[in-house]
Amino acid sequence: DAALLNQQDAPADDKIDIFLVEADNALKYVDTDYTAPVKDLGITDADLSKQYQYTKDIVTDSKGVLKGVSWQGCPGVLFYNREAAKDVLGTDDPDEVQNYVCDWDTFNDTAAKMQAKGYKMISSVNDTYRVYSNNVSSKWVEDGKVQVDDNIMKWVDDSKKLVDAKEAGTFDMWSDDWSKGFYPDGKVF
């Protein structure tokens, strides 16, 4: 950030030409003069036609101008315990299991079924955060004011319900206890 703020007075060889940004912070830079339209670099829509749209959306400014490109796409995926699926849902077939997690209301209903049979739906409420946070419709800060997107509040509400009902664990992501959920003895869907 400091280097970007000093662009005007920086010697030519010290000016930033290209910088990497994590998707979580992209919106901080997209609607600023610190970023330029990708088309100004000679990169065309045709050049980017096979990129996933979501990788372009995150770096498109409020005027619809593409200000960045991604070198990777990280799809969301749900890994599940097939034994738990058979035990609780009667099937471990991915097409059938999809019906039990097709939206948040159905996911939460399935969590109650899992809990009734002694399973947690997830090791941590943080396991679902990215799905909610990557589908927000507003910035965290607008006109100098912090705003919390409705989708983040839905995550908070859903997470609290899952924890209160003992349908989700509260382990720190990447911790040993969280990781145990990936094994049969972990009793996590």
Describe the predicted segments one by one:
Residues 33, 166-169, 181, 185-189:
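Short glycine-centered helix-capping/turn motifs at secondary-structure transition points
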Residues 39-49, 57-128, 139-173:
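Helix-loop-helix "hinge/cap" segment bordering the ligand-binding cleft or interdomain interface
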